[in-house]
């Protein structure tokens, strides 16, 4: 904790503390009001958990083992709720196919309605399980401990030099995950890259005060890339549901080609976005961030 006689924390420390408090508040909100739908609660919780995990990775050198333990706990809770997302992901994949031009020409209106109904039933059941009373209690306990930890951690020691260094570490990490050959990238490789993009997108919120307009564009482009890769992954989930003995097996022949064509379009768009976002070498990225942090600190001082 910083006392009144202590010097004001670095701009990076103040930004980090505010960001962590915002994440904790956003994670508590979906499990408190009784009138929020399970689908909306799962969506908001998954987002908060992703933000929390991304920043915990960033500050692990400062906080130590506790950050890693809390990150693993959040990851495990997110995985437990993953099944609650599959039905919704497949529904979004069907909508994506419908938005891609000539909708689903090989499927009758009746077939589309049955598919949507089955997926909705899957999603509703999984969401109810995903947010059981016991899991809500565990989530509430986790966020309470997180709130206490944020006030206890020595965040005032985090300075702009560390911010630039740590953001660069994970920028390098996402660059290393870029597929070498996009045309032959496996769903697993694209999913790993998407995970790194999500991590980077949320970590870059720390840099927002440096140049808000630029960072807004950067985060927006990262979100667009994430959305493209996410849509590709939704189609992977839909494809799995058409395999033998799965809920949509009877429509496999009609959906298979449509899924493949749409995935190709998403990969092409993701490749273009990646070329813009991650063209800069990590050394240049760090130098630019360091200069922006220094300029922002001097302007305040």
Predicted regions and their residues:
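Function-determining surface determinants
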Residues: 1-301
């Amino acid at each position: 904790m910083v006392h009144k006689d202590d010097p004001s924390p670095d701009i990076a420390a103040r930004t980090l503390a505010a960001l962590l408090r915002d994440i904790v508040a956003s994670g508590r909100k979906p499990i408190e009001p009784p009138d929020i739908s399970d689908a909306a609660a799962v969506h908001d919780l998954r987002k908060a958990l992703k933000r929390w995990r991304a920043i915990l990775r960033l500050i692990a050198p400062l906080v130590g083992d506790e950050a890693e333990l809390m990150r693993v706990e959040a990851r495990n809770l997110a995985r437990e709720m993953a099944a609650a997302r599959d039905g919704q992901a497949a529904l979004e994949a069907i909508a994506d196919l419908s938005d891609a031009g000539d909708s689903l020409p090989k499927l009758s209106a009746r077939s589309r309605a049955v598919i949507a109904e089955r997926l909705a039933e899957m999603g509703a059941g999984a969401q109810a399980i995903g947010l059981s009373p016991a899991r809500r209690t565990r989530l509430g306990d986790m966020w309470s401990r997180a709130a206490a930890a944020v006030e206890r951690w020595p965040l005032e020691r985090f300075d702009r030099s560390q911010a630039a260094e740590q953001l660069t570490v994970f920028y390098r990490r996402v660059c290393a995950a870029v597929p070498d050959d996009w045309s032959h990238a496996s769903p697993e490789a694209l999913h790993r890259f998407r995970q790194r993009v999500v991590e980077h997108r949320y970590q870059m919120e720390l840099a927002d005060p440096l140049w808000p307009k630029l960072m807004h564009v950067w985060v927006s482009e990262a979100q667009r890339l994430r959305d493209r890769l996410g849509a590709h992954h939704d189609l992977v989930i839909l494809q799995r549901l058409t395999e033998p003995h799965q809920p949509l097996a009877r429509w496999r022949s009609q959906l298979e080609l449509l899924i493949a064509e749409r995935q190709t379009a998403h990969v092409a768009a993701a490749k273009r976005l990646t070329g813009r976002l991650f063209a800069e070498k990590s050394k240049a990225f760090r130098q630019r961030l360091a200069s922006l942090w220094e300029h922002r600190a001097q302007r305040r001082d």
